[in-house]
Amino acid sequence: GSDQQYVVALNKKDGGVAWRTDRTGEMNPNPQLKKSYGTPLILDTNGRPILYSPAADWLYTYDPNTGKELNKLNYGMLGFSIVPRPVAGHGLIYVITSFMRPQLLAIDYLSSNKPSIKWKWNRGVSNQPSAILVGDEIYFVSDSAGMVTCLDAHTGKEHWRERIGGNYSASPLQSNGRIYFHSREGKTTVIEAGKEFKVVSINQLDGQLMASAAVDDQALFLRSDKGLYRIERKRD
C-alpha cells in the first residue's frame, strides 16, 4: 500500500500470520508510487523453492518457508501499482512494471544467485492485463487501442504487432493453440498462437468484460457487468 510495504504469508488452516517481511528497497518518496498488487510466483530455483515478488521499482526474492529476503533486483523507478502477474519459462521471469513507465522485463533467475535483466521491451506494454507465454513466444495487449504484441520469449525480438481494437483490463487466455483477448467493450478476439498474426474469430457479448476469464473442463466462464456467461460446445 501507500503507507506500508511488506509481504505476508498466512497459515492456510487458520488464517494466522506465518511470517511478515517488510520491503527494504528504496522507493520514490511519493506514497502513491509505492503500491504494488502483483501476484508472486514460487519457482524451483537450482533445487530449492524461491518466492519471486514484484514490487514498485524492485523484484524481491524470499524463502517461502521463513520469509527471509534473499535478493532484490532494482529495475529503476519505472513502475508502481503493479497489476500484471509475472509469468515464467525458459529460465526467465517476465515482469511488467505497470503504471508510469510500463516495460516488459525478461529476468534471468537461474544463471547466478542474483536475478539479472536479460532483455526489456517498452512499446505497447500493458498496465493491467498480464502477459501470456505460449511456447517460444510471449504476447501482451495494451490497455487502450488494443495493440497486441508478439515477441520471441528468448531474445525479445518482435515477431509482429497488430491492432485488434478496444480497451483491456482482463488478461488473455490460451487454449489449444489459440489466444483469447476480452475487451472492456465486451468483444472477444481469438487469434492463432504463432509467429504470424491470424484472427480466428470475433465475438460480442452484452456489457463490459473487465475480469479475466475462467475455465472448467470444456467450459469458458466470462463475467461482464451484466451477467455471468458459461460458453461451451454442446456435447454429443
Please name every model-derived segment.
Residues 1-236:
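Noncatalytic, solvent-exposed loop/strand surfaces
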